[in-house]
């Protein structure tokens, strides 16, 4: 489903989800009333923010909702398994890696498609105008993140030898500082870091969905398979079926609300307020996120791209079918279109 099709149906979906969420809650009160989310600074958390600000989570039976920020996906994943948070909303690579190492997590849904938000940016004086000129650049990225996959896909598409690329492992804030200091020539990261670099005079070499190279500037080239997912521990889902349904119904309601163009100004203001980002920054990057919860072939393809990367890089063996650790029932009950059903059951 493309963005236009999804937004055309957003109002109907939101209304249906409101009714379904009430029906789901009628099945039984959540087993827990206190819940904590892993949180971050980018707009992917818009559904969570709206659900909290409008009191929908409290309406669903969660009387205490807290958020905890983490510097990396691994730390958030550990907190999820330890029960310190109940919902994790990472990019799709970390949970796939965790599943393949035996850590019991389950995907409950797609929060948003964020391929366009992955940006490879470079210093203007690096003069990177062609793919092969990347060999001369030190490229900052967070190793093991979705950015690693995007760089690998870029190399594959343009026929580059990935082993020759000079990757410097560093977290996003350090990437921007290092770029400004001339310690690296480029970095590949998600928002708002790419936007901040471009605002400071950097150039866009490639986004997750389009080329910035001279040879094919503006051409649609999808190097990113990044999705933001709703992830929970298997133990939480098994022990809290009502809470799981209520949580997903509320988040899906939030997705429908933030996707409705009529709510854009309100949502952007809430996101800026809660994340501490400048409103102009949120406005500039907002359209790079598509809050489409549909379970379709696109979901499977993006998850498989990540799995294939992990397998080809030797980080996992015997890649699993993404649907084997995907639980679609709560999302389906909340009104999400499920074209490919998950195979995991509590």
Language-model region placement:
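Secondary-structure end/capping motifs
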Residues: 237-317
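Solvent-exposed, polar/charged alpha-helical surfaces in well-ordered, non-transmembrane soluble domains
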Residues: 55, 78, 82, 96, ...
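Sec/Tat-exported extracytoplasmic proteins
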Residues: 61, 84, 89, 99, ...
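Short, solvent-exposed loop/beta-turn-alpha elements that line the ligand-binding surface or hinge
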Residues: 59-63, 210-223, 291-298
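Pocket-lining segment of extracytoplasmic ligand-binding domains
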Residues: 93, 176, 185-271
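Short, glycine-/small- and polar/acidic-enriched structural segments
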Residues: 27-174, 185-191, 204-208
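Conserved C-terminal helix/tail region of periplasmic/extracytoplasmic solute-binding proteins
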Residues: 308-346
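N-terminal export signals
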Residues: 5-26
């Amino acid at each position: 489903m493309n963005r236009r099709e999804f937004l055309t149906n957003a109002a109907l979906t939101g209304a249906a989800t409101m009714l379904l969420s009430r029906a789901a809650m009628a099945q039984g009160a959540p087993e827990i009333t206190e819940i904590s989310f892993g949180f971050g600074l980018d707009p992917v958390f818009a559904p969570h923010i709206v659900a909290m600000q409008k009191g929908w989570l409290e309406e669903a039976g969660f009387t205490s909702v807290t958020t905890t920020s983490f510097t990396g996906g691994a730390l958030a994943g550990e907190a999820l398994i330890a029960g310190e948070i109940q919902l994790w909303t990472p990019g799709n690579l970390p949970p796939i890696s965790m599943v393949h190492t035996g850590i019991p997590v389950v995907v409950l849904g797609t929060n948003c498609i964020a391929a366009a938000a992955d940006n490879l940016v470079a210093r203007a004086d690096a003069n990177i105008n062609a793919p092969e000129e990347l060999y001369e650049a030190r490229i900052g990225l967070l190793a093991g993140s979705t950015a690693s996959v995007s760089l690998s896909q870029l190399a594959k598409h343009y026929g580059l030898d990935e082993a020759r690329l000079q990757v410097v492992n560093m977290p996003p804030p350090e990437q921007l500082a290092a770029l400004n200091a001339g310690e690296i020539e480029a970095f590949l990261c998600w928002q708002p870091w790419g936007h901040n670099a471009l605002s400071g005079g950097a150039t866009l070499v490639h986004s997750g969905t389009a080329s910035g190279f001279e040879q094919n500037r503006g051409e649609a080239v999808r190097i990113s398979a990044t999705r933001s997912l709703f992830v929970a521990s298997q133990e939480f889902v098994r022990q809290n079926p009502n809470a799981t349904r209520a949580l997903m119904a509320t988040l899906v309601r939030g997705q429908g609300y933030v996707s409705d163009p009529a709510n854009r100004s309100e949502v952007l203001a809430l996101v800026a307020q809660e994340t501490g980002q400048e409103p102009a920054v949120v406005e500039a990057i907002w359209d790079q996120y598509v809050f489409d919860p549909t379970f379709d072939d696109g979901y499977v393809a993006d998850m498989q791209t990540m799995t294939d990367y992990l397998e080809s890089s030797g980080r996992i063996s015997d890649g699993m079918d993404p649907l084997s650790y995907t639980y679609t029932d709560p999302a389906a009950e909340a009104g999400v279109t499920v074209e490919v059903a998950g195979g995991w059951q509590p």
